[in-house]
Structures are given as C-alpha cells and as structure tokens.
Amino acid sequence: MTALAEPETIAEPLPAVADPSGSTMIVFESVKKVYEPNVTALTGVSFTIDKGEFVFVVGASGSGKSTVIRLLLKEIEPTEGRIIVGGRDLGRLKGSKVPLLRRNLGCVFQDFKLLPNRTAAENIGYALRVQGESNAQIRKKVPEVLNLVGLAHKMNSRPEELSGGEQQRVSIARAFVNHPPLLICDEPTGNLDPDTSVGIMQLLYRINRTGTTILMVTHDREMVDKMRKRVIALEAGRLVRDERRGGYTEE
C-alpha cells in the first residue's frame, strides 16, 4: 500500500492537558451520563485508549455504546466525569472550538450518509470544501483516497450506481481523506452482507496500520471474534469487560 501522509493538525490550538508520553488518544474518567427525565445511560465508565489502537465497543442495545460516541463528538455533555480526546479536555472546550475538534476526527456510520446527487469524488470533495481546503488540494487528495479504498474507477459514479459496500468505501474515504488521528465507526458493517463486511474490515485494518486510532461500535460477533482486537464491553451503562485481545463475549 502506498505510504500515507502524517495526520494534519487542527488549524487553531485547542485546550490541552498534560500527557508526558504523548501516547494517549482517548480518556474516559468516571464518566456518568443521565438523560432527562432521569434515564442513566452511563455510570462510572473509565478507560484509556492509546494512539494507534483498534478497539471494539460491544454490548446489547441500550448498553451505552451510542452515548460513548455522542460524548466523543461533544454532541452531549457528561453529567459527571472527564473526557479527553487527543490531549484536549472536552469539558474545557468552548462551543466555538467544537467544529475544530470534529474536523480532526473521522466518522463512519451504518447508513453511509452520502449526498445522493453527487458522485463519489464530489461527496469527498464537498467534505473537504466545507473544511476550507483549496481546489488544488481537493484535486490532489480525492483521487489519492479513492485509490486507497479501491474505487478510483468509480469516482464519477453516484451513490445509486454503487453497491452497499462501495458506498461504505466512499464514506470511509470521506472520513479518512484528511488522515485524522482518530476514526470513529458506528456499526460500519451493519447494512452489509458478510463477504462485503470482510472487505470493509480489511480496509479499516489497513487504515489502522498507518497509525490511525480506530474506535468501532459493532454488533458483529463473528467479526470481533475473528479479529481478536481490544474489546470494551458495556452492559446497562457500565463497563463490564476490557480485554486486550478479546472476543465478542467473555471466554
């Protein structure tokens, strides 16, 4: 695979916390989240994820997985506890800085979220344009990332002309085009057949090998068992297992 450039930094500085080793990507410290009216989604959740890790977050529906993602994206605030992403304490982050935080993250969702009236290349280019990239940079980066995901030959195809797996590859390309240090994946294989899912996971594994940290929420038992990566398991809002080379369920 062609060597990829180092992740780009955010254009403006954000509040940082001390990390002498510089090796930490995500920290949850005793995080609690209570939704109105008095519905507890997370209780006392603590974990640390280092840069370059590939981590699965598993658990039944309602276990708190989606809340973890929403907290990481600062869509919601924790009721108690502290969250650090890339050395930045999200509790100290002003609202005006949140777009800068999200610009330094990549997100991949189950339902692709592609613009239906745009080609694969235009979907990726649009995301770059929103982030303020020049036309020259867009012309350079879009073909490179489409080649990475194996869709250089489909750059002028619209979503309706692509299979589900191809649409997800475009979604991954859009999320990774600026080489973010952290890629957050919410059920990226949830709408795909098993064979297509394998290809998507192989692609995510290749991206992880470049140094990008990947946090992936999934219900795919077979995939988690096969890959033997770190597994964080949630149950009724509590962290019940954190295993370095785990399966979907405790062995």
Regions found by a protein language model. Name each.
Residues 36, 90-106, 135, 207-209:
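ABC ATPase NBD coupling module
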Residues 73:
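Helix-to-loop junction immediately C-terminal to a conserved catalytic motif
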Residues 81-89:
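Conserved ABC transporter NBD signature motif
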Residues 118-125:
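Short coil-to-helix segment of the ABC ATPase nucleotide-binding domain corresponding to the Q-loop/switch region
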Residues 158-162, 166:
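Conserved ABC ATPase signature
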Residues 177-181:
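A short, proline-enriched helix->beta-strand linker immediately N-terminal to the Walker B motif
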Residues 183-186:
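Catalytic Walker B motif of ABC-type/P-loop ATPase nucleotide-binding domains
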